[in-house]
């Protein structure tokens, strides 16, 4: 049952993402990051977990974030800026866990991710995307540990829910909640989404609207 407060947050989230969102910056290195401004929310996850697709679903713009079938294609921190009165940025982080890229490039991308997480005061939260079909892998655990150690708030978003049976999805969600209890920087609520069907997208928008509102007070 949706309460009045829930409905209000969902409407706030809808309005936030109904505004004009646009690409503003691409950073291949920590030295080329844009100046910190407003509230930043980042999306992290394994290669092809659906980060770009979810950003497109959130904003309702199918081509805002470029998607690729090639793992590891996103090699930079990609910044998108929302409506001017919102003072919010989304950050599409390089996918991790790709096996086909050269080791030197993997090391470079990994270093960029870690340095960004450790030194970005404007970063309100990292949404760590997990493929619902596979659950949390060792490489995801390593990122969660990095976030814990750097005291960066993060929340798990399970993606591609349309490709998993309902019973399996419920089990995966509960197993994820249980695992997160061991991680001090993790927000306890697990969000379940499908960029293809739109399932869970209004709830993610609402969660982000609440978070952004708290940081702008």
Curated annotation (Swiss-Prot):
This is Probable GTP-binding protein EngB. GTP binds at residues 45-52, 72-76, 92-95, 159-162, 193-195. One of its GO terms (biological process) is division septum assembly. The keyword Metal-binding applies. Necessary for normal cell division and for the maintenance of normal septation. GO terms for cellular component: cytosol. It comes from Nitrobacter hamburgensis (strain DSM 10229 / NCIMB 13809 / X14). Belongs to the TRAFAC class TrmE-Era-EngA-EngB-Septin-like GTPase superfamily. EngB GTPase family. Its cofactor is Mg(2+). Signal peptide: none annotated. The lineage of its organism: Bacteria, Pseudomonadati, Pseudomonadota, Alphaproteobacteria, Hyphomicrobiales. Residues 37-214 form the EngB-type G domain. Keywords: Cell cycle, Cell division, GTP-binding, Magnesium, Metal-binding, Nucleotide-binding, Septation. NCBIfam families: GTPase_YsxC. The keyword Nucleotide-binding applies. GO terms for molecular function: GTP binding; metal ion binding. Mg(2+) binds at residues 52, 74. InterPro entries: G_ENGB_dom, GTP-bd, GTP-bd_ribosome_bio_YsxC, P-loop_NTPase.
């Amino acid at each position: 049952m949706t309460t009045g407060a829930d409905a209000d947050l969902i409407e706030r989230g809808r309005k936030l993402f109904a505004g004009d969102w646009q690409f503003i910056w691409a950073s291949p290195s920590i030295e080329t990051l844009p100046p910190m401004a407003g509230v930043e929310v980042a999306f992290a996850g394994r290669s092809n977990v659906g980060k770009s697709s979810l950003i497109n679903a959130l904003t309702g713009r199918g081509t805002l974030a470029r998607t690729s079938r090639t793992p590891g294609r996103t090699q930079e921190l990609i910044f998108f800026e929302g409506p001017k009165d919102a003072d919010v940025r989304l950050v599409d982080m390089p996918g991790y866990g790709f096996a086909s890229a050269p080791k030197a490039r993997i090391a470079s991308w990994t270093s960029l991710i870690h340095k960004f997480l450790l030194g970005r005061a404007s970063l309100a939260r990292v949404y760590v995307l997990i493929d619902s079909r596979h659950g949390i892998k060792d490489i995801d655990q390593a990122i969660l540990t990095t976030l814990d150690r750097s005291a960066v708030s993060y929340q798990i978003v399970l993606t591609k829910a349309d490709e998993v049976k309902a019973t399996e999805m419920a089990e995966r969600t509960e197993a994820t909640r249980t695992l997160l209890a061991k991680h001090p920087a993790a927000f306890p609520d697990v969000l379940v989404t499908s960029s293809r069907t739109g399932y869970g997208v209004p709830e993610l928008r609402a969660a982000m609207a609440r978070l952004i509102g708290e940081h702008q007070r």
